[in-house]
Amino acid sequence: MNTVIKTFTLVALMATGVFAVESVTASKNGFTQSYSNLTSDEIDRHMLGKSFFRIPWVEAPSATTARDGLGPLFNANSCISCHPNNAQGSVYTKDGLISRSMVARLSIDANDSLQHQQYMQQQGFVPDEVYGGQLSINGVKDVPYEGKLKITYEEKPIQYPDGSVVYLRVPTYELIELNYGKLNANTSISVRKAPALIGLGWVDQISDEAILANEDVEDKNHDGISGKANRVYSFEKKGFAVGKYTYKASVPTVKNQIANAFHNDMSLTTKFHLKDNCTKTQKACLNAPKAYDAIDVPNNRLDAIDFYLKTLKIPVVESKNQEGKALFDALGCASCHIPSFKTNNKERVYIYSDFLLHDMGDALSDGRVEFDAQKSEWRTAPLWGINSLEKAIGKAVDYLHDGRARSLEEAILWHGGEALNAKNSFMHLTKKQRESLIEFLGEL
């Protein structure tokens, strides 16, 4: 049997039932195609969600009341500008400028005060008092933007035992052109790249219990891997749930994440975020004109975007690389990148993640806590769809949470902490074996 990875397809349970299993050949538009068997009403919902995902929002007041309310402070004016073709963002644009897909998250260490504990319970972090939880690089008329992100890299050589050398780019992040005063010296800057919107309907169908079944916080099996779930606040449940989305698994549902992105990236209000993204010291932001409607993104539009993202096909993924798959297992990669889950509707999905948090070492620490995720802890990145990313974004792919890795090989070499043994084992492979493993990953 040559094929070792099954075709990726999405089955999403909605109120109307179960959609037919469908997939599409990897291409530039591979992440943007909808199911062919949607009903007329479902097509309307899908297209409504797609339109509000793609159209640019405008500042208030505007005659276009259906999509006004942008800002006053914001990073981008549409979802698609950070997720081109529904794929991930890049560090730089084709013109060499820092992409809008790169955002700077800001936070300070929590203390025992009631205010800080309330932040930690509902947001999972404590924002900077002046600049909030995320730097805004744009502002509407008469509202100064907060600042700009500056990235510099230092090339660090890594030598394999066989003498081969690979250079890693070590990033340094700085905020410049700050318009609201100096940044607090205790504020951490965590830079994140917009992720690809792959298989969100699948992830939604993985139960909390299925994820928790793989927890091993105390490493009772003594394999050096101690994954833990992130218990996070759910706006929908008004209580705690297992986080599945974002780089630190800090969000429990797709709809929660959509609302967070609207608030953080565009300062658009929803039922989950009722106020603009202004801090108490930003008077121009607080006094800026408001949209006609109290809620910029009403429930029906929020629901439509949620539906749109859950009814997208997944590119066909097959691998015939038996050697690469065997090495992936032998090195222990599959201990965290668990190949498959069974969903609530009994479909087995090949996702290559456990959705748990793992200590990835000091080199990848971003100084930021999100709920139970500590500074050097990250959610295991799902590996599905790698083979389609370059076609979808039209350029070379940047890997890891901040895009520092320019190749899958570099991404592996950044692994530390719980993944250090696997990385060291990879480094001791022959060049041909390393290439075989990387080829396998590139076909997922």
Question: Where are each of the predicted segments found?
Answer:
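Post-cleavage N-terminal segment of exported redox proteins
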Residues: 19-65, 86-90, 255-322, 339-342, ...
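Sec-dependent signal peptide recognition
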Residues: 2-10
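Hydrophobic h-region of N-terminal signal peptides that target proteins for export
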Residues: 12-20
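Residue microenvironments linked to proteolytic maturation
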Residues: 188, 194, 203-204, 208-304, ...
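Short helix/strand-capping connector loops at secondary-structure junctions
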Residues: 411-424
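Short glycine/threonine-rich turn/loop motifs
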Residues: 21-240, 244-247, 314-406, 410-413
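An amphipathic alpha-helix signature
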Residues: 251, 255, 409-413, 438
